[in-house]
Curated annotation (Swiss-Prot):
Stored SUPFAM superfamilies: Class I glutamine amidotransferase-like
Gene: metAA
Function according to Swiss-Prot or TrEMBL: Transfers an acetyl group from acetyl-CoA to L-homoserine, forming acetyl-L-homoserine.
Protein name according to UniProt: Homoserine O-acetyltransferase
Location(s) in or outside the cell: Cytoplasm
Record field: transmembrane: none
GO terms for MF: homoserine O-acetyltransferase activity; homoserine O-succinyltransferase activity
Substrates-to-products reaction catalysed: L-homoserine + acetyl-CoA = O-acetyl-L-homoserine + CoA
Family to which this protein belongs: Belongs to the MetA family.
Amino acid sequence: MPIIIDKDLPARKVLQKENIFVMTKERAETQDIRALKIAILNLMPTKQDTEAQLLRLIGNTPLQLDVHLLHMESHLSRNVTQEHLTSFYKTFRDIENEKFDGLIITGAPVETLAFEEVDYWEELKHIMEYSKTNVTSTLHICWGAQAGLYYHYGVPKYPLKEKMFGVFEHEVCEQHVKLLQGFDELFFAPHSRHTEVRENDIREVKELTLLANSEEAGVHLVIGPEGRQVFALGHSEYSCETLKQEYERDRDKGLNIDVPKNYFKHNNPDEKPLVRWRSHGNLLFSNWLNYYVYQETPYIL
């Protein structure tokens, strides 16, 4: 939240250089405040788990949020009841004439398919195109980030020989970017994917800025012009047990799945997971909401 200080206070310039949100008394006395409209396009099969993960993070700020859950009309969800979707979700057709302060596009377990082979790709393209003029900032996660990078900037994805699965160390590539305010130079984030985007492809697109990278996991955070589009290739929203649940699910199916790296204590799946990404996960979402949604969105959408 902003700090209200005198516009002539010498510390004001120092704080502004550090991306601390300061506000003059004059602006504070005249500003209009309303709840931020946030849409979550939930592409995950485990919809209720994903709801809790994302709402936990975006709810951990002083901002008042009006959240709208969206699902794909062109896809039949098999892991959630129709009653749940009817009660709590809308489709794009329901909201296409509205504007939103923020949009979150989640990951989806379809990464081994070409984008054009995904049954809801055409609908997703309409939503991503809509976001360019009707949403102040869009946060794309995992496959949602790959889809956004491909649709908006033509960045391809590549198959991995082995699943990128575990918790990995990342390094901040750009200092003094608002999305990374408060980040340590090295931080952890979970990854769970069979495909990747590559650093060279990101750097070849002049509109994109690579913010965080990992020697082992590759590209993690990318941002577009003015923060209108943010891409997170990892899963900073994951709860403590998520990787464990994914590991046990695939193991019980008889799939050849490795133990998630750097996750269980002593790398032993019989021991408890060690959470090393929670603080930076909270920072990522709060910075996105604060700097790229709250501070940038108009009062009248």
